[in-house]
């Protein structure tokens, strides 16, 4: 179990197959030729070819099951990846433990990315903690008064921790990681994504190296961006031009 934030965690519960996960990807890819696993170098080359050319089915043969605990408002982002199987704690059936995410620092609203953040904002942390404590106090009071759990939960803040089992195949997990490891993703979910990556990397080291090379550290150029490189003209859309400038910095052009 790896701790995340103040009360959260990620635990790798199980994986399929139990061993030689990289090799199982190769075996699935070669089944039509009747070949088993060849040399490690051959396996590495094939895995990199599959990932580079978006041959995704062999990666779906590997699955991981996690037990994850995170704040509700972070879980809402995490569970947007609908290709996973999920079973979550129910506040209708269970009394919610008094655990909430209480950040020590508050980030400012980004002036460029309207859904992002930047810098640090000075706030009265005592007041935010008091608000969270009050919400849980009201929740507990409602339960003591006999209010049903399915209604009493309505006063709980989004920073309340939830937990769930999450099963996903490697192909879809790489898509999740590509999005959630990106620097544009919210900091809190990036921390969870980093932990998930670190848990699976020793199990599929060849695949994860290819994933870093071709997905995380690779750059995709759009048609307008390629035309801009050829002609020297700016991309028409201001938003697309801004994204292109970021890519140019990475490329050093």
State what each model feature region is.
Residues 1-253:
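Family-specific signature for flavin-dependent thymidylate synthase
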